[in-house]
Amino acid sequence: MNFIDEVKIYIKGGNGGNGCVSFHREKFIDRGGPDGGDGGRGGSIIFRSNHHLNTLVNYRYKQHFIADSGENGKGSNKSGKSGKSLTLDVPIGTQIFAEDSDILLHDFTEDDQTFEIIKGGNGGLGNSHFKTSVNQAPRRRTEGEIAEEMWVQLSLKLLSDVGLVGLPNAGKSTFLSVVSAAKPKIADYPFTTLVPNLGVVYIDDEEFVIADIPGLIEGASQGHGLGDKFLKHIERCNVLIHLIDGSSEDVVADYNIVRTELESYSDYLKDKTQIICLNKIDVLTDEEIAEKTTQLQKITGKEIFPISTYTNTGITKIIKLALQTIKD
């Protein structure tokens, strides 16, 4: 399935039905009173979050959504039927913005939330409402209300507890496959991961969701590579696991590239707690591990965790630390 996280769609509520002009007709009664019924109310447009969805692909090709209009009123004081409301399902984490603006209309953070964005138009009044002492046979009625219409932008920000960040080939996809049941595409070339992947980690009778986004490169926050398109998906995370390729010739430069891109993208990411891991230590000597760990400690001022997704060295410790950070 295609991963689509940005769409623009047109939505319109159903118009109200028109009121009816009608007069009572019965045998032996020549001039019955007005009995025109009211028009039915138009249907509303409602968004609903659905945990079974993880992409906005349903709105990629169909982009116009209109609720049913109410039926016109009828004689014998019969009101028209109300139009059926239209419910549009979206993934949890979807945000709705007014067209071409930063005005947030709604943010879905839980399953089965609903948001009525457009109400259907009110039905018009039948002529029975306009009978007076001086006008016993009114031919007046009102038309149904025209419902609101608008274009909206849907933006999906995946909900996860932990975000994986690092340069391409830092080992993020392998890490995700080791700690969860997720099956991301894994290969030894940059940008194997082209879309975000989610995995659920189970440990000590608890669980949390971890997100792997495409690798960052220098200039990602300005649109280079793939990373800037998907950085928003880790803005909601509690903690970031920053993987650094231990086989790199300059681990400090690699760390600084990712740190700079996170800081440039948003304050949300800049202030996230990070667990910094020196990955792929299975290809390093003990001396190289010690040297690169020390280099990173000096530049970050934080503890560095040597790990290997190939031998599973240090993985459990990282997962437990991530869980504890989430709970704190």
UniProtKB/Swiss-Prot annotation:
UniProt KW keywords: Cytoplasm, GTP-binding, Hydrolase, Magnesium, Metal-binding, Nucleotide-binding
Main localization (coarse): cytoplasm
GO biological process: ribosome biogenesis
Cofactor(s) essential for the protein: Mg(2+)
Binding site for GTP: 166-173, 191-195, 212-215, 279-282, 308-310
EC number: 3.6.5.-
Cell compartment(s), UniProt: Cytoplasm
GO molecular function: GTP binding; GTPase activity; magnesium ion binding
UniProt-listed InterPro entries: G_OBG, GTP-bd, GTP-bd_Obg/CgtA, GTP1-OBG_CS, GTP1_OBG_dom, GTP1_OBG_dom_sf, OBG_GTPase, P-loop_NTPase
Domain (OBG-type G): residue spans on this chain: 160-327
Pfam families reported in the protein's UniProt record: GTP1_OBG, MMR_HSR1
Binding-site positions, Mg(2+): S173, T193
GO cellular component, as recorded: cytoplasm
Taxonomy, superkingdom: Bacteria
Boundaries of every Obg domain copy: 1-159
Function of the protein: An essential GTPase which binds GTP, GDP and possibly (p)ppGpp with moderate affinity, with high nucleotide exchange rates and a fairly low GTP hydrolysis rate. Plays a role in control of the cell cycle, stress response, ribosome biogenesis and in those bacteria that undergo differentiation, in morphogenesis control.
Protein family according to the UniProt entry: Belongs to the TRAFAC class OBG-HflX-like GTPase superfamily. OBG GTPase family.
Subunit record text: Monomer.
Protein name: GTPase Obg
Organism: Rickettsia bellii (strain OSU 85-389)
